[in-house]
Amino acid sequence: MKRDFTFFCRIWIGIPFFSGLVNGFSMSPPTLDNTKDQLVINANDTLNITCRGQRILDWSWPEESLSKVEFTDRQGQQSPTDTPGYREIRLKECQGVAGKPYCKILILTNAQANDSGYYRCFYKDIKAVIDGTTAASIFVFVRDPEHPFIKRGDNDMETIFITDSETHIEVPCLVSDPDLKVTLFSLVPYPEPVDGSVVTWNNKKGWSIPRHIIQNTSTFIGFYCSISVQNSQHTSSIYVVQVIGLKFYEFKLFPEDSPVELMQGESLVLNCTALVDFNTGVDFQWDYPGKKENRLASLQPLRNVLDEATEISSILSIRNIHLDDSGYYTCWANTLEMKRELTTVVIVHEKPFISLDYRNGSVIEAKEGQKSVRLSVKVSAYPSPEIQWYKNGKLISSKNSSRFKVQQHSLQIRDVCKQDAGEYMLVLKNSPAALEKRLNFTLIVNVPPQIHEKEAAPPTNLYGKGTRQILTCTADGSPPASISWQWRPWSPCDLERTRRALRRRGGRDQSPFCHNWMDLDPEHAVNPIESIDTLTQMVDGKEKTVGRVVIQNASVPAMYKCLAENRVGKDERLIYFYVTTIPEGFDIEMEPSEDPLEQDLVQLKCNADNFTYENLRWYRLDPQTVPPELDCKSLHQYATFLEGQLSFQTTSNNWVLQLNITNIQLQDEGNYVCEVQNRRTGVKHCHRKYIPVKAMEAPRYRHNPTNHTVNVSESLQMNCDVEGTPFPQLSWFKDNQPLHQISGILLQDSNRTLSIQRVREEDAGLYTCSACNQKGCVQSSATVSVIGSDDKTNVEIVILIGTGVIAIFFWVLLLVIFCNVKRVNPADIKTGYLSIIMDPGEVPLEEQCEYLPYDSSQWEISRDRLRLGKVLGHGAFGKVIEASIFGHDKKSSANTVAVKMLKEGATASEHKALMSELKILIHIGNHLNVVNLLGACTKPNGPLMVIVEYCKYGNLSNFLRAKREFFLPYRDRSPKTQSQVRRMIEAGQASQSEHQPSTSSTNPPRVTVDDLWKTPLTIEDLICYSFQVARGMEFLASRKCIHRDLAARNILLSENNVVKICDFGLARDIYKDPDYVRKGNARLPLKWMAPESIFDKVYTSQSDVWSFGVLLWEIFSLGASPYPGIQIDEDFCKRLKDGTRMRAPDNASPEIYGIMLACWQGEPRERPTFPALVEILGDLLQENSLPEIPFNVSQSSEDDGFSQASSRPPSQEEIRLACNTLPTRYYNCVPFAGCVMVGPSSTCHSRVKTFEELPMEMTSHKTQHDSQTDSGMVLASDELERFEHKHRGAMLTTATTGQSTDRLISCPSVSSSGSGGGLLRPVFFTQLSGQTFYNNEYGHLSEEGVSDYFSSSDQAV
């Protein structure tokens, strides 16, 4: 999806090639001098293995007790120590070869039996060790007749733990000789040999035993192995099998809302519930304020055995609660393997009360078109009072207007309009206690004009030639705006005049300067105009002016502009109308079927737009030699050229290269690639098509027809159950004579079923079914015997006629009743949706989705227009598939999209969840910088499909890591590029309109640009990515959505350097619960979470701002993992809360690092908003697009961080961020962004501690069988919850104190005029070393599918 006011960061000539073929450069794995999978040596021999590769190498070996000694050729080989029993592994550097410059030799002298095992050579600087990709291994057997078994310890008995779900048991009887014959014995309780036909032996792993062997006996004890070597019997350790239950599915403390508030004298009931696996014992312990004083409390245990787990509870009850009972109530659940705890706060009030005060003053100002305005108050009350809002003396109800939202104790008005101005009053009542409080507000509304399509529609679109198109501009203003239309021929705009206009207008123009505009006249239009209309419509409850131009026949590219103007101001929208016959310019069609059969004729057509491409060629990839990742440039090394028939379609101006495969065979199955060349750039692009071939199979009977004996006048049905490929043609014979369908004899289901409605005597005989296809024929016969006579009594006929008349009468009666039943009016349903979704406090958001309307005329796409491709990713209950979408005639070119659908066997609830996600995406609307909804397939004749945008370059994190070697801080900037960047910034900053959902479900076409893989990455690109993410988050925040997982892995990169935010379906409506508390344990990305989210489970738009700061760190570290080398434990969380922050990445300027620190403010209200971040990053992006400033130019001492070119006074947000734009780079003492505004000047905390300043202690936390920590990235569940409760306890018992830091630098005062030294380009330091971090950013805190935490999988896209 594109936006009409956006010029992309980098426009290069060319079209990106198919992403399924290119994923970056490939890397070959290391190679060993011994290419076999195993090596056998004798005891006391010397093991010598040489490894070569493309990167720095290292070795691993099975015997961990052996020490490692490394030396090079220059150091010489030192002799091993003479200490008896001392052995070591020696690693020696050696000379590399061409293509593999690194070499390392492993030397082990005096090898022993216990040295048997895998010896693995791997790339040292890559964390993922995978054989065949980043590593190479060989299994070495050290043959020792005296020690045939390998023992790693001194234990003669080992325990094998298994769970109920495991089907096999692995008994690790490892041997030192691969040719030994090992016998497996089971102790039941006496030794018995195990039947060798049911077990499997692997000389590298041991025995694999089916689970049922130990389930069939009650006296089973364990296993052991035996070997006879040189007339000597040897036995292994005894392996005892233990079945245990370890899973801790869920742990909750009810009520879940914290704090729990009560009135003195009421009863307190807390329920601590654990959902665990069978055979798991749980011991509950409670701690509460009155426990030490022996406060009378009752504990009631409960145990409930469910179908798949056991629910165990402990209920704490305290009657007649006192004020002294206020405090922390903690429940511990202990098992043999783990310990869980939950804490809630109980507050006991003495009497009812209401305390009320203003939060932001009594006078509130807003602008027309502003996304929302909030009337907020500070309220402290118990019990919860009744809330009433009045406007001009009239009660406000969310049922009367969907734009008014009462959330807790605040009133939010969305889509502010001039009618919202007036006097507002809040009334809080507690009728039983006779308490009432009131506050009055005054709302002032200012009105600017807006064109809404600028936020929802792309500026450039591809229009099919010969199609009817409608250009629309919707404007609102006060007074109503008038709309006029202009056009100009398709040609570049005047760049020089654009630059002068930008400077003259202060860098705030909304569109490029283009001259030669002419009024649009239907009589003299280059594209025939059907009509030009201007009308007034009610849109979202507001009166708006809509201008439409209906183009009867799109034939010539042109540029159109609509202008909306009133006496307050004006706005304009520029539309690039590009006409083409193939929207993508390049696609592949396969006829006549996507699933051909053996011996079919298959036609592959490669269609390419003649305006863009030439030199079409067909290739077939060799499946034996093609690498996993293939560049189009290296295609010829792994493919065979195929001759095709080239033709030119004059009417559509397209080239068609047709490849005919006659009489296709099984060996013809595979990947076929069409290669084309861009006419302007010469770059070659490829599309790949996989042809599956189904083998033909001869007909065969699954069940032969059976003999039948029936009475006269009864019905008879015979089935011919056959199968084959292709499906056979079926024929029936009676007494060797062909049988055809006549009255009373029916042949149904492609002749599979023969039905005789009323059997007669002459129907007896031999019936034969014959099935034939290209592979042959089969036939089978059955005898039908008829009993009785054809004579029928009149009584039977009368009964049949009477029964038919009665049945007809009842059917007519039911039809009349059904037609008179009152049906629900769809308009009533829509009204209900509008009232419910605006008050989710009464109905959960998930239930609201049932009322959300789905307009099939707008969003429904026929499944025939989709062609599914490869799977891009899997989710909890669904999958994402790459697909192509065609036009209505299925002959036009296809666009690439991503399709989200359910897996096979999905339940009704999963189907409902995907349908709810579809409706939520429709409700959120479209934006350039989010992954947008394109359409859906919901009709019942196929699977449910949700169609979204496809982003070919994958997620931003992987892209940045792959581009590290091609990172250049700066590059030459052409005037055209600088102008485009300026226009993009100004279009984003000047736009203040509400983001409206698009009414079009068509896929956005691709614009011709160079491949991003082939262009260098610059600082300007990094700032551009940051700017776009801020704009996308600004849009989501305007739709009242909180992301909660904003990270580079959830940012996708599309063509033209456009980034799109994904996984925002995980967000929740902010009005459902402002202090959103996640239920149960979940996967927590702690490195990206704000302190209030970690400690208090509070998620707001300001917590997303914190995550945005971490995302900035990722971008300017080129995809590095945040907090590198820091263990994520309790100490980390404590220091994060105390103000310790990450230091600046090497590629970040002081301005960028200042923005990071501002986003990491401990107090959420002090963090910048996303609109402010869009403004600031837009200015930085514009400055970085200017010509280079030499590195030796330094800032003056009077530089306050603001550009002199700006004629406006600095905003409060910019003044606060200016404190961080110091030219000096600090490492352990960095500038701190926490500025405090005092009159016209500002003061700052002068110093902030970073994680490098105070080394983190690398402590080890024992979490047996927890499976919740992953490479130190998150806390284990028990440690996290224990630390949260400790944090809450500290908050109640001690007053919060600010962190003391030494003042090193004073922040310069900022005058109200905002003048100061101009910003100079900062000196950036060396780029990152190229190390790739593969740490998993999550840790499992619950079993998948058990927690009620809503999750979405979406595109791998």
From Swiss-Prot:
Modification Phosphotyrosine, positions: 1071, 1076, 1226-1227, 1334, 1338
Extracellular compartment segments: 25-796
Ranges for region Disordered: 978-1007, 1192-1212
Gene Ontology MF term list: ATP binding; growth factor binding; identical protein binding; vascular endothelial growth factor receptor activity
Catalytic site: 1045
Catalytic reaction equation(s): L-tyrosyl-[protein] + ATP = O-phospho-L-tyrosyl-[protein] + ADP + H(+)
Subcellular location: Cell membrane; Cytoplasm; Nucleus
Chief location of this protein within or outside the cell: membrane
Bias type Polar residues, positions: 989-1005
Disulfide cysteine pairs (residue numbers): 51-121, 173-225, 272-331, 473-562, 493-514, 606-674, 720-772
Glycan attachment positions: 44, 48, 114, 216, 271, 360, 400, 440, 553, 610, 660, 707, 711, 751
Side Cytoplasmic, residues: 818-1357
Biological processes annotated in GO: angiogenesis; atrioventricular canal development; cardiac muscle tissue regeneration; cell migration; lymph vessel development; lymph vessel morphogenesis; lymphangiogenesis; lymphatic endothelial cell differentiation
Family of this protein: Belongs to the protein kinase superfamily. Tyr protein kinase family. CSF-1/PDGF receptor subfamily.
Function comment: Tyrosine-protein kinase that acts as a cell-surface receptor for vegf or vegfc. Combinations of multiple VEGF receptors are required for development of different blood vessel types in the embryo. Involved in angiogenesis, specifically in VEGF-induced sprouting of new blood vessels, but not required for proper vasculogenesis or hematopoiesis.
Descriptive protein name: Vascular endothelial growth factor receptor 3
Species, as recorded: Danio rerio (Zebrafish)
Annotated gene: flt4
